[in-house]
């Protein structure tokens, strides 16, 4: 018990400086570190309908107020532009979020249609403080709220029931 408490306290003390500089509006949603990918297996009745899955993913991104920067239907990859309107910060802080989607599928061959296995989602973000044209602080990571919202939307539309 004491060891667990000591470990938790030590971890909190070591991690606290990482988040000390974050503005309050993003502290609960921005995770500093490498952006993570979340996966959704495509439900059985949609696995043979790559076109429908692809269009559903595009619509979900657009409905989440992101604009498409690049997409390649053949490779199953879509990335949005950076969205600075997810959270509006005051002062010298700038916060941008970008969503990426990647389908895992077996392409169509002669006599067989494409088969979609899963969709992967990522919501990377960066947070920067710029003062008088100079970068003062910068953080890389991901937005857990955007990731969860897009994940839940696509899970409901494409995932197992």
PLM segments and residue spans:
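Positively charged n-region of N-terminal signal peptides that target proteins for export
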Residues: 1-5
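Bacterial N-terminal signal peptides
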Residues: 7-17
């Amino acid at each position: 018990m004491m060891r667990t408490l000591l470990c938790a306290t030590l971890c909190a003390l070591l991690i606290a400086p990482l988040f000390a500089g974050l503005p309050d509006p993003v502290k609960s949603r921005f995770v500093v570190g490498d952006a993570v990918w979340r996966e959704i297996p495509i439900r059985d009745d949609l696995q043979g309908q790559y076109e429908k899955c692809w269009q559903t993913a595009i619509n979900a991104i657009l409905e989440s107020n992101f604009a498409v920067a690049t997409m390649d239907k053949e490779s199953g990859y879509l990335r949005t532009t950076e969205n600075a309107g997810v959270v509006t910060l005051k002062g010298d802080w700038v916060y941008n979020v970008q969503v990426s989607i990647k389908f895992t599928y077996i392409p169509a061959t002669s006599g067989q249609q494409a088969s979609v296995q899963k969709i992967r989602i990522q919501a990377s973000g960066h947070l920067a403080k710029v003062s008088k044209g100079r970068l003062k602080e910068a953080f890389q990571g991901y937005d857990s709220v955007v990731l969860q919202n897009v994940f839940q939307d696509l899970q409901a539309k494409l995932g197992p029931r």
